[in-house]
Structures are given as C-alpha cells and as structure tokens.
Curated annotation (Swiss-Prot):
Induction: By water stress. This is Water stress-responsive protein 7. Keywords: Stress response. It comes from Pinus pinaster. The lineage of its organism: Eukaryota, Viridiplantae, Streptophyta, Embryophyta, Tracheophyta.
Length: 35
C-alpha cells in the first residue's frame, strides 16, 4: 500500500501469518511509544 496506515496494516497482517504473538509485542510497543 502507498499509505502509511495501509503499510502498517499489511505489516501486521504479515506478522500475524508468521507468529501471532508478535502482534501483541508490536501493539504494546506502539502504545508505549504513543503514550
């Protein structure tokens, strides 16, 4: 995808197919950075 949101969503989708546990780590990291 050309958009940042689209690329982020695609990256999460790819991680989900590889290792669902990575999603939790990614989200936790994003929340920590945002918060």
């Amino acid at each position: 995808s050309d958009t940042t949101a689209g690329s982020y969503a695609e990256a999460l989708a790819e991680l989900l197919t590889i290792d669902p546990s990575l999603i939790v780590t990614t989200v936790d990291t994003q929340l920590a950075v945002a918060g």
